[in-house]
A protein has these predicted regions:
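Acidic/His- and Gly-rich active-site-bordering loop/insert found
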Residues: 3-138, 155-165
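Active-site alpha-helical elements of protease catalytic centers
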Residues: 133, 137-151
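Histidine/acidic-residue-rich, glycine-tolerant segments that coordinate divalent metal ions
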Residues: 163-173
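Acidic side chains
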Residues: 88, 140-141, 171-173
Length: 173
């Protein structure tokens, strides 16, 4: 059990380091009914992963492309791991959100039966794992995409080079 503590600390460290990335990603509207917004999401995802050594291929569909991201291992016969996530959110009614704009993420803490907005700066002062980030598509499904990025960056920081090919399919509908 004690051996897992450094990894838990690493997970918290890289989770917190990626909050600005999550905020940036959540700030891009992602209603698939608005193609121009979805192309901004495609651009952002492609740029963010290619900066980490992935190649990107647009797999055309009748509506929006699916993005195939690949990073090859040094061994050409290595096995492949495939991840999937989607980058669109359900249509949103801003009036139903208890914040100024669902595409401007906010940090909140539980206060009684409600959630109270607090400054993001508090994360660097006294992190509380019970705080939550509210923003359209934060848990379904942009947040998990950022968790994957954080994990990849944490692995790299340890000097680990995965011995498998990595593919990620990102759907925008």
């Amino acid at each position: 059990m004690a051996q897992s503590i450094p990894y838990q600390n690493l997970a918290v460290e890289y989770g917190l380091k990626h909050i600005p990335t999550l905020r940036e990603y959540l700030s891009i509207p992602c209603d698939a009914n608005y193609k121009e917004d979805m192309y901004k999401n495609i651009e952002w995802v492609e740029k963010t992963f290619t900066q980490r050594g992935f190649t990107a291929t647009h797999l055309e569909t009748p509506t929006l492309p699916v993005l195939l991201l690949e990073r090859k291992a040094s061994n050409p016969s290595a096995k492949t791991i495939l991840f999937y996530y989607h980058s669109d959110g359900q249509p949103v009614r801003p009036s139903e959100w208890q914040q100024e704009n669902p595409f401007i993420p906010v940090l909140k803490q539980k206060k009684g039966d409600t959630w109270e907005q607090i400054p993001f700066e508090r994360l660097t002062q006294n992190y509380d794992p019970e705080w939550r980030i509210f923003g359209r598509a934060s848990s379904d499904d942009k947040g998990p995409g950022i968790m994957l990025l954080a994990a990849l960056d944490a692995i790299k920081s340890l000097g680990i080079s995965p011995d498998y090919h990595l593919k990620i399919l990102v759907d925008f509908e």
